[in-house]
């Protein structure tokens, strides 16, 4: 009997598919049943070969070897996951296997993961496609009843290959050229470089900003505060100090006369459902999660707990075919604290509308919403609960009536000058009943008040007149949340660019994709092009210099717009990938010529007096997310060591987080308040604390892990939190 291989992207999804398809026989990297063999990748198992794969001469980075443009680009098995590739291949080539179901993530990258494996295995069997947005049993069963023809996704695959090859051709060549030309570890790319340029522009805007003072006037009357309004501009502030100071004197002792009351019934609708970027923004704003951390937690909610739909979506809408499933999803989350809201929605009846259901605004995947899986909050970690709560409340909110209120605008005159106040009377909480936080987006200077009973013609005595003043503020520095927003909508950083390119970036979702933006930000941190101070992101000297060295069009989002426009054309079958790749090769050659002819120099302004123990050259001091490091300036040497690490250990004096400095016996905790404490003293102090759950072994284990130079934004910090070291 012939069988079908089902290729998943990850083991966890593979196990779910195998369970539904009744594949219980365990093999080496696969599960087998009567009809199906389920196997899985581990993300990418196959990738494009590095330059040294085309010849030993490319093992050394030399400017004279550039550009490197192999014909054709070769695929290689990733060494780290080579065993799993062989396990997958052995199933694909079986004689009893008649066809293959691609069950990797439903999107451009998922298509590439599977197709590259199949191509490298030299298998040409018929392909079918599983295209689902959640991995619940019901979704899997429905998906297998409606498998799509693999040929329908050929263009999507060609688009994915074109993107990967273009990134290789431009990225590899530009990075090697910059690094060898300026003898510094420099990298660039079509997404990371314009992202860095946006951070630099924001820094420049802040630096050049000149604050302008402004002035206002407030009148305190019985039961409310009135705000002066300029009759000419209708503004509640002026940049002329003499205007308000003269008014404050002239209006003293004069009453306020109510000249008009305007009452307006208003409705406020719930914010849209979450796509990945919006969820990352909110999670950073409310919980301080990094973009990568949010995606990691979300992936667990999707794969492990099966409580939410596909995470890497760029849509904030649902398609019409999802509407009949909304009732089941609501019933799955009928536990506290959501049960009362679910009951109210079900009693009223589930009503969909165009504000969140629109087929035209759903491409590969709909918005992130709960699945019908029964909710067990006790099985979730604290972070998983927080993230699920955001998704659940947003889902409930769009299914609830609008928030309704009556807005009252008061117009009064004092000595012929106009003063205003406004108040709000809630008629129906609607969707706001789901939330227990106040509006955070109300930035208006004139706040809503609880107004007394008033009538037109009323005369009120003015108890006091107060002059107010402030200054215009510079643009805020980026944090990870606002940087994600800028990457999604970079139009403000494309002044002077063609309108069609700005429009394209808007249509294609900006710089990068929902799935790659977190990694791009992380790479900028890891390569020390940007750094964090608190939550704010700053460009480093290295980042500023890099932008001076790269060709100008690599800094503009317009390059990404042009590429995405063409990649979209390839995916739709309107453009041949070969024409696009030919253009990218010419672009790479031009970029190399520009870099080679540059007369600029790169200056290490973070050089120290410490010599590298491996090569003897002076080392550079760099600030990472987890602390301070010394890195050898010789890129080929690559020696690095951590000299100060940020920890979660709290200072016994001010309770702020302490930094760990030094090595071995001499390691010392240091705090910004001036407190110093040797590691040995720290251990003794904690050992005395009978209530602490941190044993000496716990502390030593933590310190051992701290010494590893791991990528930033890892989970190490979480370990110390659990040890209760802030007692």
Curated annotation (Swiss-Prot):
Domain (Toprim): give its ranges: 3-136
- GO process terms (BP): DNA recombination; DNA repair; DNA topological change
**Is the keyword Ion transport assigned to this protein?**
no
Residues at the catalytic site:
310 (o-(5'-phospho-dna)-tyrosine intermediate)
User: EC number(s) per UniProt?
Assistant: 5.6.2.1
Q: Which GO terms describe its cellular component?
A: cytoplasmic replication fork
Region feature (Interaction with DNA): 187-192
The terms under GO molecular function for this entry are:
DNA binding; DNA topoisomerase type I (single strand cut, ATP-independent) activity; magnesium ion binding
Where Mg(2+) is bound, by residue? 9, 105
Reactions it catalyzes: ATP-independent breakage of single-stranded DNA, followed by passage and rejoining
Which UniProt keywords are given for this protein, alphabetically ordered? DNA-binding, Isomerase, Magnesium, Metal-binding, Topoisomerase
Pfam families in the record: Topoisom_bac, Toprim
Name the site position(s) for Interaction with DNA. 61, 168, 176, 312
Q: Where is the composition biased (Basic and acidic residues)?
A: 685-711
Residues covered by the Topo IA-type catalytic domain: 153-592
> Which coenzymes or cofactors are required?
Mg(2+)
Where is the segment annotated Disordered? 685-713
Q: Which family does it belong to?
A: Belongs to the type IA topoisomerase family.
> So what does this one do?
Releases the supercoiling and torsional tension of DNA, which is introduced during the DNA replication and transcription, by transiently cleaving and rejoining one strand of the DNA duplex. Introduces a single-strand break via transesterification at a target site in duplex DNA. The scissile phosphodiester is attacked by the catalytic tyrosine of the enzyme, resulting in the formation of a DNA-(5'-phosphotyrosyl)-enzyme intermediate and the expulsion of a 3'-OH DNA strand. The free DNA strand then undergoes passage around the unbroken strand, thus removing DNA supercoils.
Q: What is this protein called?
A: DNA topoisomerase 3
Organism from which the protein derives: Bacillus licheniformis (strain ATCC 14580 / DSM 13 / JCM 2505 / CCUG 7422 / NBRC 12200 / NCIMB 9375 / NCTC 10341 / NRRL NRS-1264 / Gibson 46)
Query: What are the leading ranks of the lineage?
Result: Bacteria, Bacillati, Bacillota, Bacilli, Bacillales
């Amino acid at each position: 009997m012939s069988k079908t291989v089902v290729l998943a992207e990850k083991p966890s999804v593979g196990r779910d598919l195998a369970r539904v398809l009744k594949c219980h026989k365990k093999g080496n990297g696969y599960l087998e049943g009567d009809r199906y063999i389920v196997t899985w990748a581990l993300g990418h198992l196959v990738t494009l070969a590095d330059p040294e794969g085309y010849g030993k001469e490319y093992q050394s980075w030399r400017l004279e070897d550039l550009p490197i443009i192999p014909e054709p680009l070769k695929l290689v098995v990733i060494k780290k996951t080579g065993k799993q590739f062989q396990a997958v291949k052995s199933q694909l080539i079986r004689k009893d296997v008649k066809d293959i179901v691609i069950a990797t993530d439903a999107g451009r990258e998922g298509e590439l993961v599977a197709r590259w494996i199949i191509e490298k295995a030299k298998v040409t069997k018929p392909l079918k496609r599983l295209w689902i947005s959640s991995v619940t049993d019901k979704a899997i069963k429905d998906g297998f009843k409606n498998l799509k023809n693999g040929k329908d996704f050929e263009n999507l695959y060609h688009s994915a290959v074109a993107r990967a090859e273009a990134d290789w051709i431009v990225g590899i060549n530009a990075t090697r050229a910059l690094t060898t030309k300026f003898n510094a570890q420099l990298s660039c790319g079509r997404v990371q470089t314009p992202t860095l340029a946006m951070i630099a522009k924001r820094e420049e805007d802040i630096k050049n900003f000149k604050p302008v003072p402004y002035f206002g006037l407030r009148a305190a009357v019985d039961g409310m505060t009135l705000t002066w309004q300029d009759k000419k501009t209708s503004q509640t502030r002026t940049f002329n100090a003499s205007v308000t100071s003269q008014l404050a004197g002239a209006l003293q002792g004069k009453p306020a006369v109510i000249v008009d009351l305007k009452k307006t019934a208003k409705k406020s609708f719930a914010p849209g459902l979450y796509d990945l970027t919006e969820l990352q923004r909110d999670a950073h704003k409310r919980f301080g999660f990094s973009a990568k951390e949010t995606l990691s937690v979300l992936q667990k909610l999707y794969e492990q707990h099966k409580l939410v739909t596909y995470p890497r979506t760029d849509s904030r809408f649902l398609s019409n075919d999802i509407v009949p499933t909304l009732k089941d999803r609501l019933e799955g989350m009928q536990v506290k604290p959501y049960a009362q809201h679910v009951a109210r929605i079900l009693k009223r009846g589930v009503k969909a509308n165009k504000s969140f259901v629109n087929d035209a605004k759903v491409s590969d995947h709909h918005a992130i919403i709960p699945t019908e899986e029964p909710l067990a909050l006790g099985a979730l970690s604290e972070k998983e609960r927080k993230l699920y709560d955001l998704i659940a409340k947003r889902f409930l909110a769009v299914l609830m009536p609008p928030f309704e209120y009556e807005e009252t605008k008061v117009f009064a005159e004092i000595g012929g000058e106009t003063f205003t106040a406004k108040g709000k009377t809630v008629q129906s909480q609607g969707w706001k009943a789901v939330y227990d936080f106040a509006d955070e987006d109300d930035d208006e200077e004139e706040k809503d008040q609880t107004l007394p009973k008033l009538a037109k013609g009323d005369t009120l005595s003015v108890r006091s007149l107060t002059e107010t003043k402030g200054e215009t503020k510079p643009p805020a520095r980026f944090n990870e949340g606002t940087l994600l927003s800028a990457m999604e909508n970079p139009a403000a950083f494309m002044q002077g660019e063609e309108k069609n390119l700005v429009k394209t970036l808007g249509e294609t979702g900006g710089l990068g994709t929902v799935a790659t933006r977190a990694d791009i930000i992380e790479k900028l941190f890891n390569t020390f092009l940007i750094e964090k101070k608190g939550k704010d992101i700053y460009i480093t000297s290295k980042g500023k210099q890099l932008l001076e060295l790269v060709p100008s069009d690599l800094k503009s989002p317009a390059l990404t717009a042009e590429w995405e426009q063409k990649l979209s054309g390839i995916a739709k079958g309107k453009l041949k990938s070969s024409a696009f790749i030919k253009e990218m090769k010419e672009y790479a050659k031009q970029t190399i010529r520009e870099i080679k002819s540059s007369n600029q120099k790169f200056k290490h302004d973070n050089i120290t007096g410490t010599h590298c123990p491996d090569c003897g050259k002076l080392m550079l001091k760099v600030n990472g997310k987890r602390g301070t490091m010394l890195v050898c300036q010789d890129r080929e040497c690559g020696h690095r060591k951590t000299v100060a690490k940020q920890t979660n250990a709290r200072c016994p004096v001010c309770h702020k987080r302490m930094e760990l400095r030094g090595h071995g016996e001499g390691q010392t905790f240091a705090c910004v308040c001036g407190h110093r404490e040797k590691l040995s003293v720290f251990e003794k102090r904690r050992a005395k604390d009978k209530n602490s759950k941190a044993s000496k072994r716990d502390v030593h284990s933590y310190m051992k892990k701290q010494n590893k130079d791991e990528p930033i934004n890892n989970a190490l910090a979480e370990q110390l939190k659990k040890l209760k070291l802030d007692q």
